[in-house]
Regions:
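Ubiquitin-like/PB1-type beta-grasp interaction modules and other compact soluble beta-rich domains
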Residues: 1-64
Length: 65
């Protein structure tokens, strides 16, 4: 399926947000995800399905000072 992630079209095989985070090689504890303009709590990622054309914004948290 094709998703729009941070403004770019990407083909993915993930069926849920959790699977997408894993497929993209991200650490779940360091990202926040907005799906179709709604922030999805991390505990809902495993049961949040993805559909062709969904728009996601993924924000990475970086530590430092």
């Amino acid at each position: 399926m094709e998703l729009i992630i941070n403004g770019e079209k990407r083909a993915v095989t993930a069926a849920t947000l959790s699977q997408l985070v894993e497929q993209l090689g991200m650490k779940a504890d360091r990202v926040a995800i907005e799906l179709n303009r709604e922030i999805v709590p991390r505990d809902r990622w495993p049961q949040t399905p993805l559909k062709d054309g969904d728009q996601l914004e993924i924000v990475h948290f970086v530590g430092g000072g």
